[in-house]
């Protein structure tokens, strides 16, 4: 998935100060993030990105925009957040919600689940 590094750097460049330019999830979701960014920037090239992370097993993409198309932006984000719940965070392959020790949730492929100590939720 390293071929996405340039595109991920472009997404990072949209992260507003004082927020860290960290994308806090594994590379299996990088394609989702790049595609989400492309769709968002087509609607509002000046949108501000605050944070991209994994939370409760799904992708979270936090933005701000003064665009009159704010609801269209939210629809794009909602679409990619839903897609993340079907995509392994490590491999980008189809995945399902899995539960690990301590109740941590991740979306993982069945091949990766046991390797990381998770089981289907």
PLM segments and residue spans:
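Short functional micro-motifs and their immediate structural scaffolds
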Residues: 93-99, 114-117
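Long, charged N-terminal interaction/targeting segments
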Residues: 1-76
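Short metal-coordination and nucleic-acid-contact micro-motifs, chiefly zinc-binding Cys/His arrays
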Residues: 83-87, 95, 102-105
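Catalytic-core loop-and-flanking beta/alpha module that positions acidic residues
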Residues: 39-40, 53, 60, 79-82, ...
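Short cysteine-rich clusters marking metal-coordination/redox-active sites
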Residues: 88-91, 109
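Short intrinsically disordered terminal tails
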Residues: 1, 115-121
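Short, mixed-charge amphipathic alpha-helical segments
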Residues: 71-87
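Cysteine-rich micro-motifs
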Residues: 102-115
């Amino acid at each position: 998935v390293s071929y996405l590094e340039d595109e991920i750097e472009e997404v990072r460049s949209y992260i507003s100060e004082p927020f860290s330019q960290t994308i806090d999830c594994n590379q299996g979701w990088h394609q989702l993030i790049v595609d989400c960014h492309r769709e968002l920037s087509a609607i509002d090239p000046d949108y501000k990105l605050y944070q991209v992370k994994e939370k409760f097993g799904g992708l979270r993409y936090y933005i701000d925009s003064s665009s009159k198309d704010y609801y269209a932006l939210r629809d794009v984000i909602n679409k990619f957040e839903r897609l993340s719940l079907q995509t392994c965070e490590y491999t980008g392959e189809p995945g399902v919600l899995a539960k690990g020790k301590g109740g941590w949730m991740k979306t993982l492929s069945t091949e990766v689940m046991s390797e990381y100590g998770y089981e289907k939720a």
